[in-house]
Regions:
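Nucleotide-activated chemistry modules centered on ATP-dependent adenylation/adenylyltransferase
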Residues: 1-238
Length: 238
């Protein structure tokens, strides 16, 4: 893989602090690929992901732009302007038909990138793994280093480990380390928050009172909390 620089373009790496985008960024830096900015939008991220961004900031020769997104404001206070819930306060928990937090993250990144580009053509590196190639968006402005190098998710994790990025062991327990309060997370990921980050779990329970939607269509967060309490109690017996 070697990308040619467009003298009239700007090159951005969008990262989350997870294994794939981190492997991509390290690969770009090691191969001295065209790269002007590394950018991330921080919105209810696992601490391990934030620590990865901290570490990248220290070693990267290019600027790392951290866009802060006020998740709590949009969750409970933002006045909805359109649609069925126009006039309501806060989006509440994301649903299958309203993954607003994903859109908010993407829109904040795009807004920042547009400001950085200042009229130049934007080339964006996307950390999609080779075994997730179906997620790729065919666009001349989108670049997929992991796909081009046929690096699968497990390859990416090993690559990060070999470069000293171990995610503090998070991938021994989690499948993903992006948003810790995502309703679409696997139960094992949620249990990790419950058992390892009681402060974040309590924050989720506090947020729950402001949502007009249950955490999941068939289960409230309080019900999940009660289930986790039973599991924790049973584990203490052995």
């Amino acid at each position: 893989m070697k990308y040619s620089r467009d003298p009239n373009g700007i090159y951005i790496a969008s990262i989350s602090g997870g294994k794939d985008s981190t492997a991509m960024t390290l690969l770009l830096l090691e191969n001295n690929e065209p790269l002007d900015y590394i950018i991330t939008a921080e919105i209810a991220d696992f601490p391990e992901a934030l620590h990865v961004i901290d570490k990248l900031e220290k070693i990267s020769p290019v600027s790392v732009i951290r866009v802060k997104v006020d998740f709590e404001y949009y969750f409970k206070d933002y006045e909805i302007k359109n649609g069925k819930y126009k006039g309501y306060k806060g989006y509440g928990w994301a649903t299958l038909t309203s993954r607003w937090c994903t859109s908010l993250k993407r829109d904040n990144i795009h807004k920042t990138v547009k400001e950085l580009a200042n009229g130049k053509k934007v080339y964006e590196y996307i950390g999609i793994a080779y075994d997730e190639i179906n997620r790729r968006n065919i666009d001349s402005n989108k670049l997929y280093p992991l796909v081009d190098n046929k690096m699968r998710q497990q390859d990416n994790l090993k690559f990060c480990y070999s470069r000293g990025f171990d995610f503090e062991g998070a991938y021994n327990h989690l499948t993903r380390i992006s948003c810790y309060l995502c309703p679409f997370s696997l139960l094992r990921n949620l249990y990790f928050v419950y058992s390892q980050y009681s402060d974040l779990w309590q924050y989720m329970l506090w947020l729950d009172q402001f949502s007009r939607f249950p955490f999941r269509p068939n289960e409230t967060l309080s019900e999940i909390d009660r289930r986790f309490r039973k599991i924790a109690k049973q584990r203490k017996l052995f």
